[in-house]
From Swiss-Prot:
NAD(+) binds at residues 3-14. It catalyses: D-mannitol 1-phosphate + NAD(+) = beta-D-fructose 6-phosphate + NADH + H(+). It comes from Serratia proteamaculans (strain 568). This is Mannitol-1-phosphate 5-dehydrogenase. SUPFAM superfamilies: 6-phosphogluconate dehydrogenase C-terminal domain-like, NAD(P)-binding Rossmann-fold domains. The lineage of its organism: Bacteria, Pseudomonadati, Pseudomonadota, Gammaproteobacteria, Enterobacterales. Its EC number is 1.1.1.17. The keyword rRNA-binding does not apply. The gene is mtlD.
Length: 383
């Protein structure tokens, strides 16, 4: 199995790339970081530190790397069996051109073997969005062929991969938690889905996408925002604070009530899933900074993301949402000199006031009760 993975960052190396390599794929990473590309090509291997109860170091071997925009990447797409990404939602549009060129070349070369493309991003149906970007630039004469031979497979991914410790001098070394989950939509494959240990197939992907978004992502973000408000440094420090933990767990229970109503999840199993996530946040071996986890507050406060989407579900089903409101107010309070969206958030709040700013960012009606509630909590937080 030939695999090309876009994104040689921590998630690419520590999660998706590792699973592909473990499945004996002939794996090439595509990235723009020349230092990482050169090191991967000279060493052909790297180490993954899995931390938790059963800490271990695992070696990933037989890897190579190319520049994301290069002709080599295009040529690899023409030959690959699977293409995956972990580049971040904003970058999908930037790699679409390379993928489109690769598909055109594949068509020209008469390669009618099925190719499956899987975007492994923190977003809902990311591969469907990547497909749209690819088809925007794919020549007309290749489109019908691509629809027939190329599967764009949506997925849900979950593994906490914090940035490397400052003390590590090796740019390729990566630290990951023991837990990982990669769930793919089996209805979207062309040909047989590849056998990759750790990749689970489902025909009800949205249930798992929303379960992860409404629980892990919602909880992680609220922990970060409340942690920053309390002057705490890491996710672990924040979740060990009883007041913060109460709100975070409460918010995950509120969003969980939506999931149980919408998808029929078992209530006891979902409660256990929430407890599992709380214990992941407590992992003493993961030094996950609240400022990093809180980054991009405008995206995280948008209508389809981890704070507003579960809130909309509570409104749809007439369910409580007091803790989600606390999380939204804390997100409005997020500040970071390093994050352009945090600066833009401050400007919007100053220019429009909290009510109009939240309405603009989230799509919620400015006069709605939930906006009034969130603004009241936000104002109280500023005192």
């Amino acid at each position: 199995m030939k695999a090309l993975h876009f994104g040689a960052g921590n998630i690419g190396r520590g999660f998706i790339g590792k699973l592909l390599a473990d499945a004996q794929a002939e794996l090439t990473f595509a990235d723009v970081n020349q230092t990482v590309l050169d090191l991967l090509n000279s060493r052909k291997s790297y180490q993954v530190h899995v931390v938790g109860e059963q800490a271990r170091v695992e070696q990933v071997n037989n890897v190579s790397a190319v520049n994301s925009g290069s002709e080599e990447a295009v040529a690899l797409i023409a030959e690959a069996d699977i293409v995956t990404t972990a580049v971040g939602p904003q970058i999908l549009a930037k790699i679409a051109g390379t993928i489109a060129k690769g598909l055109s070349k594949r068509h020209q070369q008469g390669n009618s073997q099925p190719l499956n493309i899987i975007a492994c991003e923190n977003m809902v149906r990311g591969t469907s969005q990547l497909k749209q970007h690819v088809f925007d630039v794919l020549p007309q004469e290749d489109q019908a062929w691509a629809l027939q031979h190329v599967g764009f497979v949506d997925s849900a991914v979950d593994r906490i991969v914090p940035p490397a410790e400052a003390g590590s001098s090796d740019p390729l070394e990566v630290t990951v938690e023991t837990f990982s989950e990669w769930i793919v939509d089996q209805t979207q494959f062309k040909g047989q889905p590849p056998a990759i240990a750790g990749m689970e197939l489902t025909d009800n992907l949205m249930a798992f996408v929303e379960r992860k978004l409404f629980t892990l992502n919602t909880g992680h973000a609220i922990t970060a925002y409340l942690g920053q408000q309390a002057g705490l440094q890491t996710i672990r420090d924040a979740i060990l604070d009883p007041k913060i933990r109460q709100v975070v767990k409460g918010a995950m229970e509120e969003s969980g009530a939506v999931l149980i109503k919408r998808y029929g999840f078992d209530a006891a199993k979902h409660a256990a899933y929430i407890d599992k996530i709380l214990s992941r946040f407590e992992n003493p071996y993961l030094h996950d900074d609240v400022e990093r986890v809180g980054r991009q507050p405008l995206r995280k406060l948008s209508a389809g993301d981890r704070l507003i989407k579960p809130l909309l579900g509570t409104l749809e089903y007439g369910l409580p949402h007091a803790n989600l409101i606390q999380g939204i107010a804390a997100a409005m309070s997020y500040r970071s000199e390093q994050d352009p969206q945090a600066k833009e958030l401050v400007e919007l709040l100053a220019k429009l006031g909290p009510k109009a700013a939240l309405a603009q960012i989230s799509g919620l009606p400015a006069e709605s009760e939930v906006v009034e509630q969130a603004v009241a909590v936000y104002n109280a937080m500023q005192k």
